[in-house]
């Protein structure tokens, strides 16, 4: 693939994550990318903008509950992509999608726009622009409603709830003063977690705040799988209750799809067929009330190694082989692996060294 501008020097597969804001989301994804791609020889994955935390802010103490977060200081010097320092102008959220489109034309292989519902005026236009396929590429969107903090919340529990805001507060002389709900600092105005996400999080001891110079990634880095499963479950429930565009829904998030893309995991809803085509293979699986349905789609036989299909129990942190012997399917042949999953179980399929597919149970809505 031809590369132009700053990206001519790239020989790796380049992913850029264009974020709303310069703290919460860039901090989260920068830390995630550092952990999973810090020494990668094949991928160049970074956020735009890079976290812009003043040195004095990064050195200040910040209470975030029962964990120590990672503080990021502004970097000076060194080689950086021009794009990382460029100010993105325009009307949100369309401006982030347009920028993600622009950098793909300059050699970026895959781009994502990460933003919240908020009160942005151009949601419909942003979604339409993202879905345009130009030169074989589209812009991927990682969207949250009410906000990114709802995605974080799903790492601690499953909740389908319509919050009014991330933080309760009021504007005084043009500046928002937050009530810090859940701390009893403003008892007359404290929503007790009924209206704002951070108030709910404080009440339940998940975190104290989310808008400082400290990354939220340490909060959930050991719960990423739980967050992915709960987010997929949330979309299933949302789809069962409304057919409105996602930018009109509350709650909603698909940030987990981006996270899964980065950590090599993909969730598949109950009853949905997943097809794998790679390395000469072509087969499909679907989970239903009888168990795991497996079909060989190619014109020759397919071998499935013992233990390729596992039942993983998240609560017990245990795995059990679903296929206790090697499976051989002729062309067009199907097989059924009987199983019934609880809410805490998923079927894990390691389709390659880099990727794991997770088939979810039939959650009660």
Which sequence ranges carry the predicted segments?
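Structured loop/turn residues at secondary-structure junctions
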Residues: 20-21, 118
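Short N-terminal binding/cap micro-motifs at the start of the first secondary-structure element
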Residues: 23-28
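Intrinsically disordered, low-complexity Pro/Gly/Ser/Thr-rich segments with frequent PxxP/GP/PP motifs
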Residues: 320-344
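Conserved beta-strand elements of the Class I
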Residues: 16-18
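C-terminal accessory helical subdomains adjacent to catalytic cores in phosphodiester-
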Residues: 2-12, 30-86, 94-310, 315-317, ...
């Amino acid at each position: 693939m031809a590369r132009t501008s700053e990206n001519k020097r790239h020989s790796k597969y380049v992913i850029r994550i264009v974020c709303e804001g310069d703290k919460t989301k860039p901090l989260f994804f920068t830390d995630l990318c550092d952990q999973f791609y810090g020494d990668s020889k094949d991928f160049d994955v970074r956020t735009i903008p890079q976290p812009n935390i003043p040195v004095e802010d990064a050195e200040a103490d910040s209470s975030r509950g029962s964990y120590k977060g990672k503080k990021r200081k502004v970097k000076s010097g060194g080689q950086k992509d021009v794009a990382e320092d460029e100010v993105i102008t325009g009307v949100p959220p369309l401006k982030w999608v347009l920028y993600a489109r622009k950098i793909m034309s300059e050699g970026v292989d895959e781009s994502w726009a990460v933003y919240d519902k908020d009160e942005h005026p151009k949601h419909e236009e942003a979604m339409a622009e993202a879905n345009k396929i130009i030169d074989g590429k589209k812009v991927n969107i990682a969207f949250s409603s009410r906000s990114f903090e709802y995605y974080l919340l799903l790492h601690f529990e499953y909740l389908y709830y319509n919050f009014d805001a991330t933080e309760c507060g009021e504007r005084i002389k043009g500046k928002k003063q937050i009530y810090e709900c859940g701390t009893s600092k403003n008892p007359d105005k404290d929503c007790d977690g009924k209206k704002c996400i951070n108030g709910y999080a404080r009440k339940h001891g998940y975190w104290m705040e989310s808008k400082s110079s400290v990354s939220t990634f340490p909060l959930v880095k050991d719960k990423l799988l739980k967050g992915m499963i709960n987010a997929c479950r949330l979309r299933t429930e949302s789809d069962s209750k409304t057919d409105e565009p996602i930018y009109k829904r509350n709650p909603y998030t698909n940030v987990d799809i981006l996270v899964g893309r980065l950590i090599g995991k993909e969730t598949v809803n109950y009853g949905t067929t997943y097809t794998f085509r790679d390395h000469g293979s072509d087969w499909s699986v679907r989970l239903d009330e009888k168990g795991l349905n497996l079909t060989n789609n190619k014109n020759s036989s397919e071998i499935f190694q013992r233990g390729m299909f596992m039942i993983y129990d998240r609560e017990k942190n245990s795995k059990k082989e679903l296929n206790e012997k090697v499976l051989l399917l002729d062309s067009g042949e199907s097989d059924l692996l009987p199983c019934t999953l609880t809410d805490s179980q998923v079927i894990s399929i390691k389709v390659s060294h880099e990727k794991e597919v997770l088939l979810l149970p039939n959650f009660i809505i």
